[in-house]
Amino acid sequence: MRLSLPLLLLLLGAWAIPGGLGDRAPLTATAPQLDDEEMYSAHMPAHLRCDACRAVAYQMWQNLAKAETKLHTSNSGGRRELSELVYTDVLDRSCSRNWQDYGVREVDQVKRLTGPGLSEGPEPSISVMVTGGPWPTRLSRTCLHYLGEFGEDQIYEAHQQGRGALEALLCGGPQGACSEKVSATREEL
């Protein structure tokens, strides 16, 4: 009992010391409550399509950039440029990659897709992310959709202008997943 008494006093002391454990509000987090579409639909829910597009743009950009760093030769402008065969393969692999790092979490009562390349501003101190399930397949299909819609050549040209240009190509424009018109339509629903 003697060993447990000092431990108990130490714990009680921490609660009494200003700035100790007792001054902090308890941290709580709950998993996002997913509706039927978010749980069972084969397609990416409309309110998450902008995040999905940005995730796809990030993965394409990152994979192309990694492939370029592996090149030993540069073009006349000093920039490393992939051959059509290589960038086509890299983009195909980007879509078939494992998307397990992505999932959904709720921040300020808004469900958002989260994962590499999607951070916006300060992260919440605690949150719960739902991963796996339909999300990897949905992201892979979204990636394949953009690959088919724009083609490898146009995507690689945008990549060469920078990550922002690639994201603007895939997600911007009047009908893009992140356009204000599409966002306004989502809010009306």
From Swiss-Prot:
GO cellular component, one term: cytoplasm
Prevents secretion from ER, short sequence motif: residues: 186-189
Source domain of life: Eukaryota
A single BP term in Gene Ontology: positive regulation of immunoglobulin production
UniProt keyword terms in alphabetical order: Apoptosis, Cytoplasm, Disulfide bond, Endoplasmic reticulum, Secreted, Signal
Post-translational modification remark: Forms an interchain disulfide bond with IgM monomers.
Paired cysteines (S-S): C50-C178, C53-C171, C95-C143
Segment forming the signal sequence: 1-22
Tissue specificity statement from the Swiss-Prot or TrEMBL entry: Widely expressed with highest levels in adult brain, small intestine and lymphoid tissues such as thymus and spleen. Expression is frequently lower in intestinal-type gastric cancer. In obese patients, more abundant in omental than in subcutaneous fat.
PROSITE patterns: ER_TARGET
Subunit structure comment from the entry: Part of the ER chaperone complex, a multi-protein complex in the endoplasmic reticulum containing a large number of molecular chaperones which associates with unassembled incompletely folded immunoglobulin heavy chains. Isoform 2 interacts with CASP2 and CASP9. Interacts with HSP90B1 and PDIA3 in a calcium-dependent manner.
Function description: Associates with immunoglobulin M (IgM) heavy and light chains and promotes IgM assembly and secretion. May exert its effect by acting as a molecular chaperone or as an oxidoreductase as it displays a low level of oxidoreductase activity. Isoform 2 may be involved in regulation of apoptosis. Helps to diversify peripheral B-cell functions by regulating Ca(2+) stores, antibody secretion and integrin activation. Acts as a hormone-regulated adipokine/pro-inflammatory cytokine that is implicated in causing chronic inflammation, affecting cellular expansion and blunting insulin response in adipocytes. May have a role in the onset of insulin resistance.
Similarity field: Belongs to the MZB1 family.
Protein's UniProt name: Marginal zone B- and B1-cell-specific protein
Species of the source: Homo sapiens (Human)
UniProt lineage: Eukaryota, Metazoa, Chordata, Craniata, Vertebrata
